[in-house]
Amino acid sequence: MSAATDEILEKLKSLSLLEAAELVKQIEETFGVSAAAPVGGMMMAAPGAVPGAAAEPEEEKTEFDVILEEVPADKKIAILKVVRTITGLGLKEAKDLVESTPKPIKEGTNKDDAEETKKKLEEAGAKVTVK
């Protein structure tokens, strides 16, 4: 390895759990990726069609996407507040997300978190699906 990568690795080893979680969140936001996506099944499913078909349903049982389908105009502000709370997005980003439905609010989350997110959004008046 190069000196630069060795140095980065040593700095990563010294991070606390909280700092590591913040780093993951910043990387996800900066590069538009999800740390949950490269679990292995998705990338490995592409080369082999038959084994991939068997692996995908297993992942779908443990990882869920919460999709904001519809936002009634009279409920937009309440839904916007809930979206900001759930995602941690800024006002402009959350507004853009709410106005461009259907859009995923959370991806690759567990069942309990997906159901809780759906409940909060539906209480605010949004139409939501969990896939």
Curated annotation (Swiss-Prot):
GO biological process, one term: translation
Region (Disordered): 99-131
Molecular function in Gene Ontology: mRNA binding; structural constituent of ribosome
Source organism, top-level taxon: Bacteria
Keyword Ribosomal protein: yes
Biased composition, class Basic and acidic residues, residue ranges: 99-125
HAMAP family in alphabetical order: Ribosomal_bL12
Protein role: Forms part of the ribosomal stalk which helps the ribosome interact with GTP-bound translation factors. Is thus essential for accurate translation.
Record's protein name: Large ribosomal subunit protein bL12
Lineage: Bacteria, Bacillati, Cyanobacteriota, Cyanophyceae, Oscillatoriophycideae
Gene (UniProt): rplL
